[in-house]
Design a protein with these regions (language model features):
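Conserved ABC transporter NBD signature motif
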Residues: 67-75
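Helix-to-loop junction immediately C-terminal to a conserved catalytic motif
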Residues: 59
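ABC ATPase NBD coupling module
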Residues: 22-25, 76-93, 123
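Short coil-to-helix segment of the ABC ATPase nucleotide-binding domain corresponding to the Q-loop/switch region
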Residues: 103-113
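Conserved ABC ATPase "signature" region
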Residues: 74-75, 116, 123-141
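Conserved ABC ATPase signature
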Residues: 83, 145-148
Length: 148
């Protein structure tokens, strides 16, 4: 990505679900926002005000219906799925409101999952996951499912 003064820039961004229908929902309605390097930003608002939608757009999980989103000076609409995946993996961190573990996987498999996306080989991946689980006191629960 080219160097840019602003890390994030939204210009007149809309996210419209069911556009043109009677039940159309404008989750984002002309949002403009600039976040510079080193800035901290809190997104607050009432339930249903578009916070999660905006975070999904900012995190490259969703694209705006219209408007411009520049991430580090690059228009995210011009990026391929592979490039967006790389950005999500290497440049954007997510902390979800819910723990979002995959219920069908063991604790160990859930910890290994991001390492798979990073291309870490199976032996190293398991060693790294076991070490991380030991550090947080969960080494004895590696075969458990998240709900156990």
């Amino acid at each position: 990505m080219p160097m840019a003064k602003n890390l994030v820039e939204l210009r007149d961004v809309y996210k419209i679900y069911g556009e043109g229908r009677e039940s159309e929902v404008r989750a984002l309605d002309g949002v403009s926002l600039t976040i510079g390097k080193g800035e901290f930003v809190a997104v607050v608002g009432q339930s249903g005000s578009g916070k999660s939608t905006m975070m999904n757009v900012l995190g490259c999980l969703d694209i705006p219906t219209r408007g411009t989103y520049l991430l580090g000076g690059t228009d995210v609409r011009e990026l391929t799925d592979k490039e967006l995946s790389h950005i999500r993996n290497k440049q954007i961190g997510f902390i979800f409101q819910q723990y979002n573990l995959i219920q069908s996987l063991t604790v160990l498999e859930n910890v290994e999952l991001p390492l798979i996306y990073q291309g870490v080989n199976a032996d190293d991946r398991q060693d790294m996951a076991l070490e991380a689980l030991a550090r947080v006191g969960l080494a004895n629960r590696i075969k458990h499912r998240p709900v156990e």
